[in-house]
């Protein structure tokens, strides 16, 4: 462990999360608010805590997160990715376990752009034969 804080940057869709963790009691603060206050849905909170629960470190670290961009789902995914990277920065032996669960890999799916002459990314205008 180098220094007191371990950090990791997580990304998902258009969200970016900078995560800092240090030894503590398991408190998670996102953008200055408790995680329960910041994320409205329980599923988002669960997504954020998955790497900690998998590695049995849920009550080991105090985590401070700065997250920006995107919506609730993207931000939760970015926080999970950032926590995963910070845990690997803390202890590299956790990487195989986290990698097997699929938390280390950055989810590269992005919104496809709308094309000219289409209603959306792929939805075409209605075809009229006559």
Swiss-Prot record:
A Pfam family annotated for this UniProt entry: Ribosomal_S9
GO molecular function: RNA binding; structural constituent of ribosome
GO CC terms, sorted: cytosolic small ribosomal subunit
Annotated GO biological process: translation
Entry similarity comment: Belongs to the universal ribosomal protein uS9 family.
PANTHER family: RIBOSOMAL PROTEIN S9, SMALL RIBOSOMAL SUBUNIT PROTEIN US9M
Protein name per UniProt: Small ribosomal subunit protein uS9
The organism of origin for this protein: Albidiferax ferrireducens (strain ATCC BAA-621 / DSM 15236 / T118) (Rhodoferax ferrireducens)
């Amino acid at each position: 462990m180098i220094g007191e804080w371990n950090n990791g940057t997580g990304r998902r869709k258009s969200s970016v999360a900078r995560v800092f963790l240090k030894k503590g009691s398991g408190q998670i603060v996102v953008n200055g608010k408790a995680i329960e206050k910041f994320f409205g849905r329980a599923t988002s909170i669960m997504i954020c805590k998955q790497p900690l629960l998998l590695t049995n470190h849920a009550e080991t670290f105090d985590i401070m997160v700065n997250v920006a961009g995107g919506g609730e789902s993207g931000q939760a995914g970015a926080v999970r990715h950032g926590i995963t990277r910070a845990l690997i920065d803390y202890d590299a032996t956790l990487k195989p376990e986290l990698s097997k669960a699929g938390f280390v890999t950055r989810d590269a799916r992005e919104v496809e752009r709308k094309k000219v002459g289409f209603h959306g990314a792929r939805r075409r205008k209605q075809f009229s034969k006559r």
